Swiss-Prot record:
It comes from the Eukaryota. It comes from Homo sapiens (Human). It holds the Pfam family DUF5537. This is Putative uncharacterized protein C8orf89.
Amino acid sequence: MSVLSPEIKCETSKFTRSSFGSCLIFESSWKKAVLETQKIKKEYTTAFGLEELKECIKMPYLPGLQSCQKSVSSTPLEVPKRLPRADAEVSAVRLKKTKETCSVAPLWEKSKGSGFSDPLTGAPSQYLERLSKIAILEYDTIRQETTTKSKKSKKRDLRDR
């Protein structure tokens, strides 16, 4: 983590907890959720002999993505209107700009060959509970932020009239 040098100082007297208003409503519950998740992660890391995640992580194979000979940025694909028959395994798609062909295999075919399984199928119930609690907190936070934004914009509209 980076450390602030002595030259960079912030006047803390200007900022108080109440001056932030509703921004910090979920702060304590988010902190609890993050700390509890980190604790569970550490337990499973030591219990199963897993390594800590490094900064450089290889991206896993994502099924359903196209494998092209040459990547072309922002080129639209010409997709056939009819799907090929079930016996045809791979359909060819031609890029309009470069006329290069890409092979597009159906999603279910590519997922069979990938070595990655769904990480949630074998996950412990505690881990799944933590994920669902975090998702609920995230949903509540986003919902609250959008409702306060819409209320503020309505108040501004009424004042402007």
